[in-house]
């Protein structure tokens, strides 16, 4: 018994990411669209352990342990009428009547407050059905109203009710150039401030970086959100694959925190994935373990726009899937450490966590020319806690400052019952976060002044 994991998908970004993730899980476990075993499924290794993600009903159907919440009815109505309507439990699709209008305060204070008890109640019901609940995976965006506001509210409630369970977030982070809302910087800063204490580990993904990967590696001239989400789903799947399938080195949720988070506040690992390659090119490439490992350290394969060569790595988790043996993986790491461009902080000599899983990576089949991922024998996902991600925070803070210096758009937030002081408080917290990253990167780390903080 590996322990169950509950997926929470909040807001439009979380819901659409959820669709792609479950689409992939069904494929990996050999289940059809309605959650029943699909007789035509190939490559399925006796289905792995279903319990982690699915509840089995008495008539042999598998129901995802997942909850979809959005204050805006339309994304969830799409699930209710879409191809997977038979799959999800209708009680676990919760939609509001009016949306959060890209406003953190609406998601956190006014509209979100009315829904949160109902949502916690449903979570409790699913959690009570579990033998040993291991934790929560929370999918949301930092830029939208529901994702940022309601996401923060729900995490606050989860940490009071399920304090000991691990809470891992997948957060879609506002990209430098691609923006879906003017007030994204406000929402993201406010949301980060209120979740930083309540989340154990937050994997950041920014749309621009994933767009670039799709454009460059999959030759999709204009990637859609489906393309992006399928790529992110691969990473989500490899993070949880060792809970579901056998491997040489299994990794559970708590191990990510233990190995990736050196200080409670510095819990924002970067993710990268290799190989991202289209079916037309895959015949001409060799995917040796070492090459894949090196690819992960290329800025081109990372899911946040920042340059790790400017920072130092504190900890790295490499999760291999498919045909990989520990010896090759260790050799790849040794070769990597020998490269001069790879900087580890001095106070963390080993720096690497390995996971190896025998279940081969699968890709959702796509029409030729639609830029699907090529089926490959092995893949690697890398989660790395690097000080370079501070670049992403300082970009965000800069945008926040530009708007806040003129108090632009602030009245929308205050009108929903927020106090203006919360803006400056959140901004100070992020300034402190940037400073934390600076201190960690400084090699001569003075223990005595750092002790008061941690």
Swiss-Prot record:
Gene3D superfamilies tied to this protein: Helix hairpin bin, Tubulin/FtsZ, C-terminal domain, Tubulin/FtsZ, GTPase domain
GO CC list: cytoplasm; microtubule
PROSITE patterns cross-referenced by the UniProt entry: TUBULIN
GO biological process, one term: microtubule-based process
Cofactor: Mg(2+)
Reactions the enzyme catalyzes: GTP + H2O = GDP + phosphate + H(+)
Site (Involved in polymerization): 454
CDD domains: alpha_tubulin
Cross-referenced SMART domains: Tubulin (SM00864), Tubulin_C (SM00865)
Keyword Cell wall biogenesis/degradation: no
Function comment: Tubulin is the major constituent of microtubules, a cylinder consisting of laterally associated linear protofilaments composed of alpha- and beta-tubulin heterodimers. Microtubules grow by the addition of GTP-tubulin dimers to the microtubule end, where a stabilizing cap forms. Below the cap, tubulin dimers are in GDP-bound state, owing to GTPase activity of alpha-tubulin.
PANTHER family attached to this UniProt entry: TUBULIN (PTHR11588)
Subunit text: Dimer of alpha and beta chains. A typical microtubule is a hollow water-filled tube with an outer diameter of 25 nm and an inner diameter of 15 nM. Alpha-beta heterodimers associate head-to-tail to form protofilaments running lengthwise along the microtubule wall with the beta-tubulin subunit facing the microtubule plus end conferring a structural polarity. Microtubules usually have 13 protofilaments but different protofilament numbers can be found in some organisms and specialized cells.
Protein name: Tubulin alpha chain
Source organism (scientific name): Colletotrichum orbiculare (strain 104-T / ATCC 96160 / CBS 514.97 / LARS 414 / MAFF 240422)
Gene: TUB1
């Amino acid at each position: 018994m590996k322990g169950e994991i509950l997926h929470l998908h909040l807001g439009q970004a979380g819901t659409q990411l959820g669709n792609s993730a479950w689409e992939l899980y069904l494929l990996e476990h050999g289940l059809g669209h309605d959650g029943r075993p699909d007789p035509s499924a190939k490559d399925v290794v006796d289905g792995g352990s279903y319990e982690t993600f699915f509840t089995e009903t008495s008539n042999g159907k598998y129901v995802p342990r997942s909850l979809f919440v959005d204050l805006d009815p339309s994304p969830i109505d799409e699930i209710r009428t879409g191809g997977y309507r038979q799959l999800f439990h209708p009680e676990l699709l919760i939609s509001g009547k009016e949306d959060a209008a890209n406003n953190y305060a609406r998601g956190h204070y006014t509209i979100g407050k009315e829904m949160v008890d109902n949502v916690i109640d449903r979570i409790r019901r699913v959690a009570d059905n579990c033998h040993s609940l291991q934790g929560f995976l929370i999918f949301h965006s930092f830029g939208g109203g529901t994702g940022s506001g309601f996401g923060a509210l729900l995490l606050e409630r989860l940490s009071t009710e399920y304090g000991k369970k691990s809470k891992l977030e997948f957060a879609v982070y506002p990209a430098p150039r691609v923006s879906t809302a003017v007030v994204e910087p406000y929402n993201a800063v406010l949301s980060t401030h209120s979740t930083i204490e309540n989340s154990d580990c937050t994997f950041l993904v920014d749309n621009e970086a994933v767009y670039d990967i799709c454009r460059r590696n999959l030759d999709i001239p204009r990637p859609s959100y489906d393309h992006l989400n399928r790529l992110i789903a691969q990473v989500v799947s490899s993070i949880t694959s060792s809970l579901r399938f056998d491997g040489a080195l299994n990794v559970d949720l708590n191990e990510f925190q233990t190995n990736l988070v050196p200080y409670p506040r510095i819990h924002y690992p970067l993710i990268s994935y290799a190989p991202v390659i289209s079916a037309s090119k895959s015949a001409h490439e060799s995917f040796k373990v070492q090459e894949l490992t090196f690819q992960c350290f290329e800025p081109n394969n990372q899911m946040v726009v920042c340059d790790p060569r400017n920072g130092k790595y504190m900890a790295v988790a490499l999760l291999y899937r498919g045909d990989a043996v520990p010896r090759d993986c260790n050799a790849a790491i040794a070769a990597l450490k020998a490269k001069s461009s790879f900087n580890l902080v001095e106070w963390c000599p080993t720096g690497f966590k390995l996971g190896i899983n025998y279940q081969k990576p699968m890709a959702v089949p796509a029409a030729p020319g639609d830029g699907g991922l090529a089926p490959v024998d092995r893949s690697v996902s890398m989660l790395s806690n690097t000080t370079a991600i501070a670049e992403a925070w300082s970009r965000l803070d800069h945008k926040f400052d530009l708007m806040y210096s003129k108090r632009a758009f602030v009245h929308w937030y205050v009108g929903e019952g927020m106090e203006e002081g919360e803006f400056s408080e959140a901004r100070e917290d992020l300034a402190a976060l940037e400073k934390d990253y600076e201190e960690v990167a400084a090699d001569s780390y003075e223990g005595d002044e750092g002790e008061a903080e941690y």
